[in-house]
């Protein structure tokens, strides 16, 4: 018996030990709920989760409390009642009082300190999406800002592109604004206006007046109940709740007191099961249970902290458990499909689309998380309308942006009284001018001042305004650019600048300028039919042939001229020598005649030059046969030289040499760029975009990018100043410039053919009428008249098509040569006269000297013959000769001085 008793005790002990080793792991889940009833629902949900995920390893246990009256008591309760029980997660509902938005905050702060996940059940404030504040907060409901997705889908459904966003300047309003702007940016659109106001503002009339002045009639409102009430009251005073308007709001804006003042026809949202705490408890417990079972399949799982007193260590497994929760997917929830985004907010949520009809909210559709499903109930819009409003009001006052680009838009300063000076076209008609505000390029700092605009595009604008019945105000683009996309603050985000940017940002309603139509721009704006067809061409400086004074010598090189001159003198010397030493150099017909003199060196020179210049030989020809043979050879040489010179002179002076211009876009100097040949275009223009996009032109683009100019006017001036060799731009502009500035010329065939169009936003109500009027203007000849008036292609140089003829410039050197000969002749005649006088004086002096010697000799002979006294007459004659000789010496000296002066 004793043995049996011991055996039974041993079996009982072993059974108890085995059972103790198989006890499941108790995992506590905490909750802070609004009522005791919801605590019971929470416990039942935990039991259901244990049954659904039955396992002997893990058993879930429910630990819950109700909300406390203040934040401190709530934080203490979380520490004492929940964290002390080592809870793995805490579920928290919204407090019963609708105005108490901060009760989940102490729970989130306390649990977040230890990295214990907190799952919100009905808390929708956007502040809980900020993970820098609420580290471990998740929720099974979306924030209020998530309603922006439904507004965006409604805009797409009803094709509304013009919206005004009115938000309160608090965290909730800014979150809704950011969400909607992000969605619109993906669609490459934006709100026409964002109006913010301080929460608690009672009179919002001034704010809504800004909205009333806009074309958009779709108003999206994000505000609290009280602020929404103030907006509705001010809108009713301004008659902004009637026909034509659309009001899209969220859930708060049609709740409580706001609903009493909301206008009939307003469309609001209600989150399906948004306030069903019981349903969210069931879904949250199911998600936590699923995540816990996934967590315990991992290794190194630590237990949560036990209590807050003296414990400052975070739960090491807490961040891991949060990541597991955020990656959880529960498709069969009571409230629908449950998933979390990177902020811990619920991704997919279902909304009822409510329409206020006769002061009652009526469901007219459902948003199922992806798209809107409309039911059979018709929407009653503001003003009792049943037809969908267009969402905008066509304004008859348009803001026109343009750019200085002659001949399409001329910009000139106004007169002292602020008006435009009266001018006339080439046809004698008054030029139509408009006042355009814009930066003045001639004043430092480029201040915005009123200026006068006129030209092709201004005439076109005036005609469109008259035909389509709208008024306008014109301004010049602030940055002086046509428009291209550029990165913002070195980020991947790109924005349009120039006229494109002003149009897309709402600063302008229409672009009336020579804006090139291309694919990049057409993706963002709407173009009219082209009002001017054109392409790209190349502008270069014209090589004007210039004649110098020595141009008549250009047919021969200087070496050849030197050899010809040397040959003349060599032949002359040889003729002289041959004729001098020839026995037949002195020729006579018969013996009675005197012999002719042989050829002198001077005559030989005269003969040699005469034959070369074909001046005719009157005398001084060679007499000997040998010299005459050389003379004939020299004549043949002269004939060949003169004929060659004459032929080449015509080529140099009459016929233009072919200029080495650019042949087109495929010219080797463009395709193989170098620093010796610089070409460029305008920065951030359609031409710049074209070269950037074309792979085969990438080499050219890299060269051009370093040299591009800010404006076409600067580049054209650079070509004229020889700072730029070629400028690539719109053919219409360059051909006009070449017709006005005669030192410029376009070259090569057109490429990248396109056209100029009027730019409008994609949703512009004017786009169809503008295109129709442009086509009509082409048909009735108005565009042709504008071409004749403004884009007038005139011939700069009448010689371009006239027969080539010699001008004074070509032959000026020859006339200078004649003038030089005349001057040289006058100079030499003075020398000859002086020389002749000197020679005559010398000869007379010698004659007197001989006469004096003869008299002296006669007297000497008389003395020797015995006469004591000379004859008185002879003595007087001798004295006279001596006196004359003395005066002759004086004159000789004076004449010598004169010759020196002349020389």
From Swiss-Prot:
Disulfide bonds join 79-308, 420-452, 436-453, 742-796. It is a multi-pass membrane protein. NMDA glutamate receptor activity is modulated by zinc ions. The NMDA glutamate receptor activity of the heterotetramer with grin2b is stimulated by micromolar levels of Zn(2+). The NMDA glutamate receptor activity of the heterotetramer with grin2a is inhibited by nanomolar levels of Zn(2+). This is Glutamate receptor ionotropic, NMDA 1. Component of N-methyl-D-aspartate (NMDA) receptors (NMDARs) that function as heterotetrameric, ligand-gated cation channels with high calcium permeability and voltage-dependent block by Mg(2+). NMDARs participate in synaptic plasticity. Channel activation requires binding of the neurotransmitter L-glutamate to the GluN2 subunit, glycine binding to the GluN1 subunit, plus membrane depolarization to eliminate channel inhibition by Mg(2+). NMDARs mediate simultaneously the potasium efflux and the influx of calcium and sodium. Belongs to the glutamate-gated ion channel (TC 1.A.10.1) family. NR1/GRIN1 subfamily. Residues 601-622 dip into the membrane without crossing it.
